[in-house]
């Protein structure tokens, strides 16, 4: 049975459907020696030859693939791009290397935003999770600078007009702070560019800190350091797949217990290092005072 070319490539882990549509339109994809066009359909057979930028790529049936998902704690200062011409750090720099597949980011976070960013090897899963029609919840912890009153909160809940259309928070909950520096937890069901910041700016309030803490029911893992990643287990992966009406996986490549032990070992090493630094400074201080 034939399928759209971009769907086949996305499922095989060569990018999100949106990314693949762009490279097809740019004439970078060929099928059996002919330049592909957007809308072309292919049937996956052993003799099928698909090339991207002249390089022969693997297109295996989805049944042969194992969907993998990473939870990454993006720090501020990293770009959501594979390569930066200026050599700045990107979210892909620290991810584990793959053979025969690649990590696809589920959405984006702007350079000054930190927190949970999901990656998957399944382009179709990434595409569906990002699509606005799925209305997958994203939760953010936001520190704002400015006067926030009931009228502004009401506007943010009911909706304000942005340059790319109306927008609103699904929920807003005060979570601490005093004066003009306050924390709120907010949720959205779409991922427009800088939407959280633009919503607050629309009511005259600046965002001074922004952390994504949840995607769907997947929270930012406790104990995960900034720049660290952990791979989701089979139950969490299948939760995401079922959320967007994809068939569940029956096996996983992740050794979850090994991953948890690695996180725990890293925490212990950091604690030992801090203790050694404190002890050393105390001894040094004692000698100076003597």
Swiss-Prot record:
Ranges of residues in domain S4 RNA-binding: 3-75
EC number: 5.4.99.22
SMART domains in the record: S4
Region (Disordered): 251-290
InterPro entries for the chain: PsdUridine_synth_cat_dom_sf (IPR020103), PsdUridine_synth_RsuA/RluA (IPR006145), PsdUridine_synth_RsuA/RluB/E/F (IPR000748), PsdUridine_synth_RsuA/RluB_CS (IPR018496), RsuA_PseudoU_synthase (IPR050343), S4_RNA-bd (IPR002942), S4_RNA-bd_sf (IPR036986)
Keyword Transmembrane helix: no
Signal peptide (from-to): none
Catalytic activity: uridine(2605) in 23S rRNA = pseudouridine(2605) in 23S rRNA
GO terms under biological process: enzyme-directed rRNA pseudouridine synthesis
Keyword Cell membrane among record annotations: no
Top-rank lineage group of the source organism: Bacteria
Pfam families recorded: PseudoU_synth_2, S4
Active site: 110
CDD domains noted in UniProt: PseudoU_synth_RluB, S4
Keywords for the protein's UniProt record, in alphabetical order: Isomerase, RNA-binding, rRNA processing
Job of this protein: Responsible for synthesis of pseudouridine from uracil-2605 in 23S ribosomal RNA.
Protein name, per record: Ribosomal large subunit pseudouridine synthase B
């Amino acid at each position: 049975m034939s399928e759209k070319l971009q769907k086949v490539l996305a499922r095989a882990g060569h990018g999100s459907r949106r990314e693949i549509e762009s490279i097809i339109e740019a004439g970078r994809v060929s099928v059996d020696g002919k330049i592909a066009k957007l809308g072309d359909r292919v049937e996956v057979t052993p003799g099928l030859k698909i090339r991207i930028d002249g390089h022969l790529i693997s297109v295996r049936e989805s049944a042969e693939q194992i969907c993998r998902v990473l939870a990454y704690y993006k720090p501020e200062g990293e770009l959501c791009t594979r390569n930066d011409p200026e050599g700045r750090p990107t979210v892909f720099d620290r991810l584990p290397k793959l053979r025969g597949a690649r990590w696809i980011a589920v959405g984006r976070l702007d350079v000054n935003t930190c927190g949970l960013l999901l990656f998957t090897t399944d382009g179709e899963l990434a595409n569906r999770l990002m699509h606005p029609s799925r209305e997958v919840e994203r939760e953010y912890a936001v520190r704002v600078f400015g006067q926030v009153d009931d009228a502004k909160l009401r506007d943010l809940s009911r909706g304000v007009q942005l340059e790319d259309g109306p927008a609103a928070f699904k929920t807003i909950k005060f979570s601490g702070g005093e004066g003009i520096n306050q924390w709120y937890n907010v949720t959205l069901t779409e991922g427009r560019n800088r939407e959280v910041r633009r919503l607050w700016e629309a009511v005259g309030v600046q965002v001074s800190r922004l952390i994504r803490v949840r995607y769907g029911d997947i929270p930012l893992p406790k104990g995960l350091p900034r720049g660290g990643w952990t791979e989701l287990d089979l139950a969490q992966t299948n939760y995401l797949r079922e959320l967007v009406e994809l068939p569940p996986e029956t096996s996983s490549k992740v050794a979850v217990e090994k991953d948890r032990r690695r996180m725990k070992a890293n925490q212990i090493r950091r604690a030992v290092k801090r203790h050694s630094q404190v002890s050393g400074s105390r001894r040094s201080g004692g000698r100076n005072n003597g």
